[in-house]
């Protein structure tokens, strides 16, 4: 029995040693992590938050962006509103906008902040209206259909976010933006995460979801996806629904951010596996294929294994 205990302790020590070069590489770097509402419904939240708190303690600067789609939809239905989406974007009338604010800034955000505090971290909840940190313009009609109070990010004010990070805090960001007309706008959380990653010059953008990653026509997981292939899969109806803004957001970021990934939050400690080990759990997004074996820009490891 004592031998088994010692073997387990050695195994844990080896895991820490394996993580050391990755911790050294990312220490002081900013990461933007988006946790989707569907992933939160699956019960993986504490595992994700434990990972985020650990990253903060080892000198990495995580920014958490959260969704809340399933809960917003549930509240819409309580008020007799049928949720409607166009290319993964929620059609948002005035009443739905109020419900979104209530859910994101009044419930989901504070709950995540409380959980982080219980895990030993320090977090502050905010939305794009605060500061304001996100100035947005109304998003153009999609396929001839108006989206209502749906915003497109025009400016990011990084100063309050940098201040929180410099204080050792974890910003927990709700995807609400402020329009130039003074109105609040619902902004897709994947889009918010990408724009924050670009503005903050993050080393990585990680989009956590409740599926393995992006799949091809055969249903096989794509460990790497470039812009050309993504465009083909979207136009061909292979990438659909809520995966469209995820892929679009990730590809928007990769020209500036070190790397962008869509990973499976259902895998325990998926963030640590992605960042601090050689194991991969999703799809890496790249600008274009180089014709060589894809390499993780920040960690220096083969795509699909980092």
Stretches with model-predicted labels:
Residues 2-306:
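C-terminal catalytic "cap/lid" subdomain
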